[in-house]
């Protein structure tokens, strides 16, 4: 029998943010840490002298600001989704309070990162 009025769920939103955060954390974050944290400050390429003013200019640019916000917020959404489901796997059932506490923490990081980047520009 076909159910013509299926139950609505907010789970696809959280799974979408979880997936985006996981991909970002696996593909983009290691390259960012390698370049911005190790190679460029140590003059690994010998062509770019990176300093505070250049990083500030990058983050102040709209594309750099968006990159910074995504680098901070998407992995946080991924982590909080893992925490939420990890608590469930450990038989710690907090219900919707735990669910929204985890996602509220990720939303708070997103808002704070956005405000920080906007204040820089």
From Swiss-Prot:
<dbReference type="InterPro" id="IPR003418">
    <property type="entry name" value="Fumarate_red_D"/>
</dbReference>
<keyword id="KW-1133">Transmembrane helix</keyword>
<protein>
    <recommendedName>
        <fullName>Fumarate reductase subunit D</fullName>
    </recommendedName>
</protein>
<dbReference type="GO" id="GO:0045283">
    <property type="term" value="C:fumarate reductase complex"/>
</dbReference>
<keyword id="KW-1003">Cell membrane</keyword>
<feature type="transmembrane region" description="Helical">
    <location>
        <begin position="100"/>
        <end position="120"/>
    </location>
</feature>
<comment type="function">
    <text>Anchors the catalytic components of the fumarate reductase complex to the cell membrane, binds quinones.</text>
</comment>
<comment type="subunit">
    <text>Part of an enzyme complex containing four subunits: a flavoprotein (FrdA), an iron-sulfur protein (FrdB), and two hydrophobic anchor proteins (FrdC and FrdD).</text>
</comment>
<feature type="transmembrane region" description="Helical">
    <location>
        <begin position="22"/>
        <end position="42"/>
    </location>
</feature>
<keyword id="KW-0812">Transmembrane</keyword>
<dbReference type="Pfam" id="PF02313">
    <property type="entry name" value="Fumarate_red_D"/>
</dbReference>
<dbReference type="GO" id="GO:0000104">
    <property type="term" value="F:succinate dehydrogenase activity"/>
</dbReference>
<comment type="similarity">
    <text>Belongs to the FrdD family.</text>
</comment>
<keyword id="KW-0997">Cell inner membrane</keyword>
<dbReference type="InterPro" id="IPR034804">
    <property type="entry name" value="SQR/QFR_C/D"/>
</dbReference>
<dbReference type="GO" id="GO:0006106">
    <property type="term" value="P:fumarate metabolic process"/>
</dbReference>
<keyword id="KW-0472">Membrane</keyword>
<dbReference type="GO" id="GO:0005886">
    <property type="term" value="C:plasma membrane"/>
</dbReference>
<feature type="transmembrane region" description="Helical">
    <location>
        <begin position="57"/>
        <end position="77"/>
    </location>
</feature>
């Amino acid at each position: 029998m076909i159910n013509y009025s299926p139950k609505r769920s907010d789970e696809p939103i959280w799974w979408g943010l979880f997936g985006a955060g996981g991909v970002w954390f696996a593909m983009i974050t290691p390259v960012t840490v390698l370049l911005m944290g190790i190679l460029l400050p140590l003059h690994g390429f010998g062509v770019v002298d990176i300093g505070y003013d250049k990083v500030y200019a990058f983050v102040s640019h709209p594309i750099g600001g968006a990159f910074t916000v995504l680098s901070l917020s998407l992995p946080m959404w991924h982590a909080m989704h893992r925490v939420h489901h990890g608590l469930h796997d450990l038989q710690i059932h907090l219900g919707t309070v735990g669910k929204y506490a985890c996602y509220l923490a990720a939303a708070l990081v997103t808002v704070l990162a956005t405000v920080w980047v906007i204040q820089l520009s």
